[in-house]
């Protein structure tokens, strides 16, 4: 990410020592035990979806905390790994909305301009949200604010109460916010199923003369 537009813009909006503090934090936690994703994949969302290509932002909370799952993209796992419950429900809603997708790896979405961002970018094994509130939120809030500052229209997909709190950062009237309950089994039946975020997103992109996302790719 170091030479990307994201890095340059984020650096401008955070304190001068912030990236040094991130590196200190990472040195510490990765030396203490198993942390996900692999260190080289922490910023994968930003490297796979350059600022210039951003069309959609899907916000997650923190990485999957089981072995082999997290790959630096919110909600995504490698195809060789069983889909976690939230991803199962995302694919179920996609199937009802647009069509069936067999892949669990969402990298192809990222390459089309879908920023798959977690608010917290690291997690210790089997300890969900353990790194929340420690270092990452100023960084990922800056990413959301930079997405909001884009001149071209962006679709923000916010699932669940945690993500919806970030709506306060989305003030540009050019953008579209799609919000619903979280795809987790605990809440999917309270407004996620039937919300049709994928077709709504593509309709908005087409209205704005932007290439729609091939969600089935």
From Swiss-Prot:
Q: Where is the active site?
A: 62
Reaction(s) the record says it catalyses: Hydrolyzes single-stranded DNA or mismatched double-stranded DNA and polynucleotides, releasing free uracil
Q: Indicate where this protein is primarily found.
A: cytoplasm
GO BP annotation list: base-excision repair, AP site formation via deaminated base removal
Give the source's domain of life in one word. Bacteria
Q: Which GO terms describe its cellular component?
A: cytoplasm
Name of the protein: Uracil-DNA glycosylase
Pfam families (alphabetical): UDG (PF03167)
Similarity comment text for this entry: Belongs to the uracil-DNA glycosylase (UDG) superfamily. UNG family.
Q: What is its EC number?
A: 3.2.2.27
Job of this protein? Excises uracil residues from the DNA which can arise as a result of misincorporation of dUMP residues by DNA polymerase or due to deamination of cytosine.
Q: Which GO terms describe its molecular function?
A: uracil DNA N-glycosylase activity
Q: What keywords is this UniProt entry annotated with?
A: Cytoplasm, DNA damage, DNA repair, Hydrolase
Localisation per UniProt entry = Cytoplasm
Which CDD domains does the record cross-reference, listed alphabetically? UDG-F1-like (cd10027)
Gene name in the database record: ung
**Is DNA repair found in the keyword set?**
yes
